């Protein structure tokens, strides 16, 4: 299956249903009064993390997703049905970004975690809501509000404990093949690895960790050289970075300069990522004697001014690889993953009587102290509501305004 770690989609929440203007019309019930119902709320759009997915390929061609609109209100005080929500499944580790404002809406880092990304519109109010002692035959209603619409950028960021860094052909894929069941392609030319891959390293019966391999970086990657730095985002959630260094590059370059280039590209991408714990692991010591390897590594660390610990391994032969894996496991146990996001409590489902509705009602409020009936006369009392109505009256209709 093709690995897709980024997709731009259009999401549209449902509009709220409109309120209804209606009056009760029944035989022997004069002046039935208003009975127009409220509309239904529009459907919401959610993202939900699914551990069974590992790519965003489902959103490569299908780009538009719209929730259902709320139904309009009806007579007899019938409220319109709420629009159906839509839930879009995404891989664990997906980040949602508003493409217009560049605002990060949230990260989905746990299986089953759900996130609201577009809110449905509020329902409109029927004329029943506007009746009062001074407004007994209201002909007002409100319209439903539009649902949220946005262009949503989905970014998949792999969840791994350990991230591999290094120049092309440093031996990253060979290392993963040696310590896990993952089988990334290995060849003697640069950029053999084109997409990130994951491997599970089992240290013993009860301990294991996940390692991520990304395509190699070269000088100028921040400006788009090589495969660029687009895959560095997959290392943002790693707890430790393993910087694999070829102590005998086939192109004759200086390993110390190669390390400095990677450090510079990391910093240009993200200062936070450059500050993560990073271990230097010198690979391919099988290409020379132990004495030569130790002397070469000593020269490299002196040029770098590296004062922390480092490792000498051969990913091809497995030499010194098990001790490195055990040290990584000890580090992971001693440094548990910090919570990426706070688990949001499920949204309380309630009838949405919000400020929007209060404002709409306020526009039609009448002051009870107003002398609205000072000009009343006995003649007005004779002006009844359709007193001459009968079953043969074809002009009697139920809806005065039909949305």
UniProtKB/Swiss-Prot annotation:
Compositionally biased residues, Acidic residues: 365-397
GO biological process: ribosome biogenesis
EC number: 3.6.5.-
Residues that hold Mg(2+) according to the record: 173, 193
UniProt keyword annotation of rRNA processing present: no
Gene Ontology cellular component terms for the protein in this record: cytoplasm
Cofactor requirement: Mg(2+)
Disulfide bond positions: none
One example GO MF annotation: GTP binding
Family matches, as Pfam families: GTP1_OBG, MMR_HSR1
Domain OBG-type G: 160-333
Keywords: Cytoplasm, GTP-binding, Hydrolase, Magnesium, Metal-binding, Nucleotide-binding
Catalytic class of the enzyme: hydrolase
Protein role: An essential GTPase which binds GTP, GDP and possibly (p)ppGpp with moderate affinity, with high nucleotide exchange rates and a fairly low GTP hydrolysis rate. Plays a role in control of the cell cycle, stress response, ribosome biogenesis and in those bacteria that undergo differentiation, in morphogenesis control.
Family the entry assigns: Belongs to the TRAFAC class OBG-HflX-like GTPase superfamily. OBG GTPase family.
Name of this protein: GTPase Obg
Gene name of this polypeptide: obg
């Amino acid at each position: 299956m093709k690995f897709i770690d980024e997709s731009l989609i259009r999401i549209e929440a449902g509009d709220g249903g409109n309120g209804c203007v209606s009056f009760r019309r029944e035989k022997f019930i004069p002046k039935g009064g208003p009975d127009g119902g409220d509309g239904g709320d529009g459907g919401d759009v959610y993202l939900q993390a699914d551990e069974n997915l590992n790519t965003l390929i489902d959103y490569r061609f299908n780009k538009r997703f719209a929730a259902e609109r709320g139904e309009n209100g009806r007579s007899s005080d019938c409220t319109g049905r709420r629009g159906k929500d839509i839930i879009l499944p995404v891989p664990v580790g997906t980040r949602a970004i508003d493409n217009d404002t560049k605002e990060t809406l949230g990260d989905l880092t746990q299986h089953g975690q759900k996130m609201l990304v577009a809110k449905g519109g509020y329902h409109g109010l029927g004329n029943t809501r506007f009746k009062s002692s001074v407004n007994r035959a209201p002909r007002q209603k409100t319209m439903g509000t539009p649902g949220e619409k946005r262009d949503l950028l989905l970014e998949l960021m792999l969840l791994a404990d350990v991230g591999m860094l290094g120049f092309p052909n440093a031996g990253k894929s060979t290392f993963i093949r040696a310590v896990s069941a993952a089988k990334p392609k290995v060849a003697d030319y640069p950029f053999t690895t084109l997409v990130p891959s994951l491997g599970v390293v089992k240290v013993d019966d009860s301990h294991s960790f996940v390692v991520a391999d990304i395509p190699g970086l070269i000088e100028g990657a921040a400006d788009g050289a090589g495969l660029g730095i687009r895959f560095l985002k997959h290392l943002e959630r790693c707890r430790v970075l393993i910087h694999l260094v070829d102590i005998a590059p086939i192109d004759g370059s200086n390993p110390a300069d190669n390390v400095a280039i990677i450090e510079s590209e990391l910093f240009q991408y993200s200062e936070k990522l450059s500050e993560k714990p990073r271990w230097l692991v010198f690979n391919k010591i099988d290409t020379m004697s132990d004495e030569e390897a130790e002397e070469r590594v000593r020269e490299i660390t002196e040029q770098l001014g590296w004062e922390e610990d480092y490792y000498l391994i051969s990913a091809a032969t497995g030499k010194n690889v098990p001790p490195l894996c055990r040290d990584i496991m000890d580090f992971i146990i001693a440094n548990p993953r910090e919570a990426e996001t706070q688990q949001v409590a499920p949204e309380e489902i309630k009838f949405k009587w919000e400020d929007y509705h209060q404002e709409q009602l306020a526009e039609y409020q009448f002051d009870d102290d107003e002398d609205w009936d000072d000009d009343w006369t006995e003649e007005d009392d004779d002006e009844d509501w359709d007193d001459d109505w009968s079953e043969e009256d074809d002009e009697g209709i139920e809806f005065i305004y039909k949305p």
